[in-house]
A protein has these predicted regions:
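A conserved helix-loop-beta module that forms one wall/lid of the active-site cleft
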Residues: 97-125
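ATP-binding N-terminal substructure of ATP-dependent carboxylate-amine bond-forming enzymes
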Residues: 1-106
């Protein structure tokens, strides 16, 4: 069985419990999950092996990334899955500074994807 350590951000979101259970039950893998959120009472806290409170990503990007890097080292993280839009943007913007795999798109593409007007412009024929 392959072991993998995953860091999931914004585990206080509505879909977090289902997503975390799905990761945990992935056949062929022994998965340890580190969950983060800016709030102590995040619902996903109950579904992770370790829980850490992080600063809000959009509030102080550099501090947020510094804390992400600390957790990657502390828990030997193999993969980061950012679950909040703001976390996704910040992590994608600084992904070259983070020493593990990250499940996120290109920063410039995400900026377009999160703006309905820009998506419409990009898709116009």
């Amino acid at each position: 069985m392959k072991k993998i350590n995953i860091l999931v951000t914004t585990v206080g979101g509505v879909t977090s419990p289902d997503i975390l259970k799905a990761y945990r039950n992935t056949p062929g893998y022994e998965i340890k999950i580190v969950g983060t959120d800016a709030f102590e009472f995040a619902v996903g806290k109950m579904f992770v092996d370790h829980f850490e409170i992080l600063p809000i990503s959009k509030g102080n990007e550099k501090l947020f990334i510094k804390e992400i890097k600390r957790l990657v080292k502390k828990y030997s993280i193999d993969l980061i899955i950012p679950c909040g839009n703001d976390d996704n943007l910040v992590i994608s913007r600084y992904k070259d500074l983070i020493p593990c795999k990250i499940m996120t798109g290109n920063y410039k593409d995400l900026l377009i994807a999160y703006d309905k007007g820009k998506v419409y412009e990009e898709l116009e024929f």
